[in-house]
Design a protein with these regions (language model features):
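Carbohydrate transferase catalytic cores enriched for Leloir-type hexosyltransferases
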Residues: 1-371
Length: 371
């Protein structure tokens, strides 16, 4: 059993993919190891702790939520603190958000993506300077960097010119058991069961998540499909979300397009399981856990042919050009019109999803330490 220090300072209130990663890895590692968890006071109620006997929470003032203050703390205070604490290694699960210097013990970092290099205008000039000039300098000081896909690993080498030998591809897992359950709380979803629906689970962020091209694809579908299927979005509104919602308000099909907002874990499995198709049109993803969640829920998946999505989906998905609404429309229509294709995709998806787990992910982290 090892003693591991994990910084959860980059936790987003439990409402993002990074949040899910942090609490999933923390809980999995705590099954067999002792964890000291650094976390802001305001985040404690949002953090689902499953093995409390092995997790020691170290609370910090919410004042540290300010990005600059938080970075300075990781740079100067944490290294000093580590001189008086005995840990086997430090794990930073959101490496692009928290700077660090060379700590006096082994330090492992997970990098999720470099989406800012692929999505023009995602960040302002100040933040892009931080991303391009500051982050790579500190990543070079890590003992090992875990990239959650080959796509992310390739970006780290291409844009940051990091040594390939210190970057380990370590695929994300997901909570498979949660999505195998046929029962889940309704949480306002029941009204959509009266009509079939195409589902997209992602924060409403423009342009990165590419909701507009999916909406345009839906508008191009045959009338029969539009009459039979709604388009349902589940996710909190983020940067540019108002652009997506304004477009829908002016669409002829605004009554067919539903925004559920953030859907909590108790209702998410039912939302997936009752979908007829999962569409993932994002321009760029470091991994794409929703693909696995949909597959485990026995829902066929169509997704972008970019970044990590084809890598994660494998032969179980149909891909499209996310820049081409016509191509998105064609793939959606093809799957919805062909029952044999749908059933084949569902079977392939169930087997594909079984290849990914948090247990496997965390084992690789520990294995790297033991090397």
């Amino acid at each position: 059993m090892y003693k591991i220090l994990i910084s959860a300072m980059g936790y987003d209130g439990g409402k993002s993919g990074i949040s899910e990663y942090i609490h999933s890895v923390t809980n999995e590692l705590s099954k067999t190891h002792k964890i000291d968890l650094l976390i802001l006071k305001k985040e404690i109620t949002n953090f689902p702790i499953k093995n409390s006997e092995n997790i020691h929470i170290i609370k910090f003032s919410d004042y540290l939520a300010k990005p600059v203050i938080n970075m300075l703390w990781h740079l100067f205070i944490l290294p000093f603190t580590l001189k008086f604490k005995k840990y086997d290694f430090v794990f930073l699960p959101a490496g692009n958000r928290r700077l660090f210097c060379r700590y006096p013990i082994k330090t492992f970092i997970t990098m999720h993506d470099l989406s800012q290099y692929h999505i023009k205008g995602k960040y302002d000039k100040f933040r892009m300077f931080y991303v391009k000039k500051i982050i790579p300098r500190f990543l070079k000081k890590a003992d090992k960097i875990f990239a959650i896909s080959k796509s992310t690993r390739g970006d780290l080498v291409k844009f940051y010119r990091l040594n390939e030998n210190k970057i380990i591809v370590n695929y994300n897992g997901f909570n498979a058991d949660k999505f195998k359950k046929k029962e889940s709380k309704d949480n306002g979803i029941k009204k959509f069961k009266e009509k079939k629906y195409i589902l997209y689970v992602a924060r409403i962020e423009h342009p990165g998540k590419n909701h507009l091209n999916l909406i345009k694809a839906y508008e191009m579908l045959p009338e029969k499909i539009q009459a039979e299927y709604n388009l349902v979005f589940a996710g909190s509104s983020w940067n540019g979300g108002e652009i997506v919602k304004d477009y829908v308000m002016n669409s002829t099909f605004r009554n067919n397009i539903k925004f559920l907002g953030f859907v909590d874990d108790s209702a998410l499995p039912g939302l997936y399981r009752n979908a007829s198709l999962y569409a993932f049109p994002s321009f760029y993803e470091g991994f794409g856990i929703p693909i696995l969640e949909a597959m485990s829920s026995e829902v066929p998946v169509v997704c972008s042919n970019t970044s990590s999505l084809p890598e994660v989906g494998g032969e179980a998905v149909y891909t499209f050009d996310p820049n081409n609404p016509g191509d998105i429309k064609d793939k959606i229509e093809y799957v919805l019109k062909n029952d044999d294709i749908r059933l084949n995709m569902i079977e392939k998806g169930k087997f594909r999803a079984k290849e990914f787990s948090w247990k496997k992910h965390c084992k690789q982290i520990v294995d790297e330490y033991e090397k």
